[in-house]
């Protein structure tokens, strides 16, 4: 009994001894948690400052390049103004499209060669801004949306002319006429034969214009563009010495079907097999136009391609405006409406 009493006394003494230590440890833990929270906040603020500094450096570089190129391109801008004034570029584009054959295999598409007058194409090539003006998140896949917020005068004015005038006043009406019959079949598929005439009356306009820069390692799986796009136009801005390899891949799709959602559609994700039919060459002053109906298209530049290889293209869609399209979709039978409203996310990165 004496031994037990001694043990209990020792335990009580130990607890009294440890109590302040436990309190100290608890306080220490609180301080550590507070310090950890402060460090996280500090890291966040430092990260934000780092990002702002990077953006500031980027804008500074863009401003320096803009000033230098504005001086260099003074005479080129004068030549551009003369071409815009006489309207010769628009007439040339319309004629080139009208005289190009429409290919129906594996789906309606056409490749227009010598799309622009040579003198304008040279200006268009000169107007491609340096890399710092492109989005810098992914060096393999960089985009520059139009219109530009900041850039050399030649780049801003040429790309604005391409997007606002050439695409709208020359390319759009010419390709709409060329693809008139295939578009009627597409309207039947998307809206039903009873809504074909209504769909054919919808005003169509270019949208989503962007200058794209692609490098070795780039891969885009076979896909169809968002359903709202009736036609896709890809202008190849190759240099005279560029290899024609690694253009746009055209696929035939076995067991093809209409997408049941409006987003980009990847047939292989839905059990369909894609067969490569051909690769449209990356050729100077040419344009690929295709109906966004069946089949698929993609692109690939192998990682072991020359490190200096660059692929510049300008892409835009032609389709009805969102409000006009939504008004028509609201009138469709429920089973057709569902194919326009059901969202579908994909693991693939956008083009």
Language-model-derived ranges and their functions:
Residues 119, 128-136, 178-190, 194, ...:
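A generic secondary-structure signal for well-formed alpha-helical elements
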Residues 102, 106, 110-114, 161, ...:
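Short, charged/polar micro-motifs that form catalytic or ligand-binding hotspots
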Residues 111-113, 210, 232, 289, ...:
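Short beta-strand segments
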Residues 3-45, 217, 224-229, 239, ...:
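Catalytic core of Fe(II)/2-oxoglutarate
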Residues 2-149, 339-351:
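N-terminal auxiliary "cap/dimerization" subdomain that precedes the catalytic jelly-roll/cupin core
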């Amino acid at each position: 009994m004496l031994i037990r009493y001694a043990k209990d006394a020792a335990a009580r003494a130990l607890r009294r001894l440890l109590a302040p230590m436990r309190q100290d440890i608890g306080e220490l833990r609180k301080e550590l948690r507070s310090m950890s929270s402060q460090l996280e906040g500090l890291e966040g603020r430092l990260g934000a400052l780092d990002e702002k500094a990077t953006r500031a450096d980027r804008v500074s570089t863009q401003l320096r390049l803009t000033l230098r190129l504005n001086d260099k391109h003074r005479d080129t801008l004068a030549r551009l103004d003369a071409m815009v004034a006489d309207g010769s570029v628009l007439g040339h584009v319309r004629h080139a499209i009208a005289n190009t054959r429409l290919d129906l295999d594996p789906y309606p598409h056409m490749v227009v060669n010598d799309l622009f007058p040579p003198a304008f194409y040279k200006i268009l090539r000169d107007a491609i801004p340096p890399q710092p003006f492109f989005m810098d998140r992914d060096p393999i896949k960089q985009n520059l949306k139009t219109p530009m917020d900041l850039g050399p005068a030649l780049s801003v004015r040429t790309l604005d002319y391409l997007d606002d005038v050439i695409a709208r006043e020359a390319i759009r009406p010419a390709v709409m006429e060329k693809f008139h019959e295939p578009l009627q079949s597409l309207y039947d598929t998307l809206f039903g034969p009873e809504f074909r005439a209504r769909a054919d009356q919808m005003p169509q306009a270019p949208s989503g214009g962007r200058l794209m820069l692609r490098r070795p390692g780039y891969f885009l799986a076979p896909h169809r563009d968002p359903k709202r796009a009736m036609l896709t136009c890809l202008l190849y801005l190759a240099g005279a010495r560029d290899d024609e390899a690694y253009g746009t891949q055209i696929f035939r799709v076995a067991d093809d079907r209409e997408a049941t959602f409006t987003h980009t559609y990847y047939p292989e994700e839905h059990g369909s097999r894609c067969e490569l039919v051909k690769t449209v060459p990356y050729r100077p002053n040419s344009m690929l136009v295709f109906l966004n109906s069946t089949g698929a298209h993609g692109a690939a530049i192998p990682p072991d391609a020359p490190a200096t290889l660059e692929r510049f293209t300008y892409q835009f869609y032609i389709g009805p405006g969102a409000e006009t399209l939504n008004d028509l979709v609201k009138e469709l039978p429920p089973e057709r409406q569902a194919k326009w409203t059901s969202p579908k996310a994909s693991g693939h990165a956008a083009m």
